[in-house]
């Protein structure tokens, strides 16, 4: 199991086929998601979804910063620490797909509705890609921090 940090976009105004130029009209604000993955399940099939759908995966929070509080979501420091050790440190300027593209692309295949949350993706440094891999273990603590938004801290607990 690994955790990766992403910035998340809560949607306020739904829509379909949203042009990139109008993305701001649809973003309520910004929050944090710890995109936890059970890599053993994820790699067992050609579809990654199963490894991301366990109970307690994808914790979100601890708050939502409204869109007017973040001038540019593409200029935010983002980091993940595991037991206090920095595992990922980057900036949202390094996203493969920017927020306007994500909203336009996703709304081209599905209707976005108020309350939907879009995760932006993660920077380099995920645990399973390290040499050697670094898996999450019971007792570990994962902290995800995004500049201007806050810090989300999650303990790793064995499934009962």
Which residues does each PLM region occupy?
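Short, small-residue-biased leader/transition segments that mark boundaries at the very start
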Residues: 1-9
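Short, conserved beta-turn/loop elements at beta-strand boundaries and strand-helix junctions
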Residues: 12-16
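N-terminal accessory regions of nucleic-acid-interacting proteins
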Residues: 17-30
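Catalytic-pocket segment enriched in acidic/His residues
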Residues: 31, 37-160
């Amino acid at each position: 199991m690994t955790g990766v940090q992403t910035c998340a976009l809560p949607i306020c105004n739904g829509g379909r086929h949203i042009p990139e130029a109008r993305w701001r009209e649809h973003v309520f604000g910004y929050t944090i998601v710890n995109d936890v993955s059970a890599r053993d399940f994820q790699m067992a099939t050609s579809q990654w979804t199963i490894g991301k759908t366990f109970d307690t995966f994808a914790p979100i929070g601890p708050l939502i910063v409204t869109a007017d509080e973040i001038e540019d979501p593409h200029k935010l420091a983002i980091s993940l620490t595991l037991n206090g050790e920095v595992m990922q440190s980057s900036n949202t300027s390094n996203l493969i797909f920017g927020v306007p593209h994500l909203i336009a692309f996703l709304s081209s295949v599905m209707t976005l509705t108020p309350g939907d949350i879009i995760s932006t993706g993660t920077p380099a440094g995920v645990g399973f890609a390290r040499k050697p891999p670094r898996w999450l273990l019971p007792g570990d603590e994962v902290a995800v921090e995004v500049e201007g938004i806050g810090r989300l801290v999650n303990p790793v607990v064995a499934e009962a």
